[in-house]
Every structure is written in structure tokens, then in C-alpha cells.
């Protein structure tokens, strides 16, 4: 069952010198990437975004960032979706080596945005795209971080709702990745408190500490 509201997909190859892949690390391998089209923990729209993005960059022969040689461009595609309204936040993460490989980054990013917006218009796409971002990351390690971030389209956040509370989630927000599971945990905690020895009234407040934005780490 699809439950994830955030995924960090990695660009790479499925085997040494193989074709471009976009997905998750294969079990037991730091370098080999498995394209996860049709993955059960994400929805169908996610797979459409993944497939379209892979085809876009494969067709233009844009190389992935090699983590041993520290050469290449494409690093990650970070996708978030709100369960409350179905909106997506899509963040393309690359190195800054575009010129080295002869690419016009501005032109290519504009084409990338146009491709995603055309995908959004298709009958098969059920959700909507709230924002598309571009992040530069020249860190040597295999971590998604931002040296510079640019908003390419729309807004730089999505909104989520848990038990009547609304949250604004930015590209690098720390937020529980299973919205439904988080809601169940809060309902259980609230139930235990209400049935326990400590009764809450209008003058009492429950604090959820040490958990990022306050939605269970």
C-alpha cells in the first residue's frame, strides 16, 4: 500500500557503465541503482514522475554524478506529496558541472519544467504539482543538501494536515514520512492520555518534544 509522502531518488546506473537509472540503491550495493517504477510504497503518479524524469535526462545524455570520481551532474530527485490535497513538490538536485559537459543549464531546466507540467495535464495524472525546485549540491558525500536552491515553478512548499492541524512543508523540512501512520499514533497517544490519570481540560497543553516539526520523529 502506498504510504510514503517523501522519497529521495538517486541517479546512477544499474551496473557499471550501464544506462542511466533513477531510483533506490540496490540491496548490499552503495553504487548500483535500481529504477523503482511501480514501487508499492508510492503512488502511481510518483512512478509517472520518475519515469518521465529518467526519460528526459536519458534522452539528453546528461551524466549522473559519480560518487567515487566526483564527476557528473545528476544527483537526486526529491519528491514530496501532500495527502491532504494531492499536491507534489519536486526538487531536482545536481552538481554544478553543467558547463564542463557543455550543457545550457537554464535552457535544460526550463525544458524540464515544461515536461513535468505537460505530464500534470495528462489524464492519467491524478495529483497536481505545487512547485518545482532546483538545488545545487557539490558535497563529496552521498547526502542531499543545498548549496543553492532556486524555485523554478509555483511555490516552495506543500501543505499537510494531521488531526485538524495544518503544516507547511518545505523541501528540506524534517517531517514524518508516513502521514497516515503518524495520525494513528497521535490518536492513540491522545486516547491514552484521556483515559489515564492525568485529565486534560481547556487549560492543559500536551507537548510533543524532540521530533522535528512536532509530528513524531
Q: Which residue stretches match the model-derived regions?
A:
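Accessory RNA-recognition modules of RNA-modification enzymes
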Residues: 1-217
Amino acid at each position: 500500500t502506498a504510504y510514503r509522502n517523501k522519497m529521495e531518488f538517486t541517479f546512477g546506473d544499474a551496473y557499471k557503465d550501464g544506462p542511466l537509472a533513477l531510483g533506490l540503491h540496490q540491496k548490499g550495493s552503495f553504487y548500483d541503482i535500481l529504477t523503482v517504477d511501480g514501487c508499492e510504497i508510492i503512488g502511481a503518479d510518483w512512478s509517472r514522475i520518475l519515469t518521465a524524469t529518467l526519460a528526459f535526462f536519458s534522452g539528453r545524455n546528461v551524466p549522473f554524478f559519480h560518487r567515487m570520481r566526483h564527476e557528473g551532474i545528476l544527483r537526486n530527485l526529491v519528491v514530496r506529496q501532500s495527502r491532504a490535497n494531492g499536491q507534489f513538490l519536486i526538487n531536482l538536485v545536481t552538481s554544478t558541472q553543467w558547463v564542463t559537459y557543455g550543457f545550457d543549464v537554464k535552457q535544460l531546466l526550463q525544458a524540464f519544467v515544461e515536461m513535468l507540467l505537460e505530464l500534470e495535464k495528462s489524464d492519467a495524472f491524478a495529483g497536481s504539482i505545487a512547485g518545482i525546485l532546483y538545488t545545487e549540491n557539490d558535497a563529496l558525500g552521498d547526502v542531499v543538501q543545498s548549496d543553492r536552491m532556486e524555485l523554478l515553478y509555483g511555490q516552495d512548499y506543500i501543505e499537510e494536515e494531521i488531526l485538524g492541524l495544518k503544516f507547511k512543508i518545505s523541501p528540506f523540512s524534517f517531517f514524518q514520512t508516513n502521514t497516515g501512520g503518524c495520525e494513528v499514533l497521535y490518536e492513540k497517544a491522545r486516547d491514552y492520555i484521556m483515559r489515564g490519570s492525568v485529565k486534560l481540560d481547556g487549560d492543559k497543553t500536551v507537548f510533543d518534544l524532540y521530533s522535528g516539526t512536532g509530528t513524531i520523529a
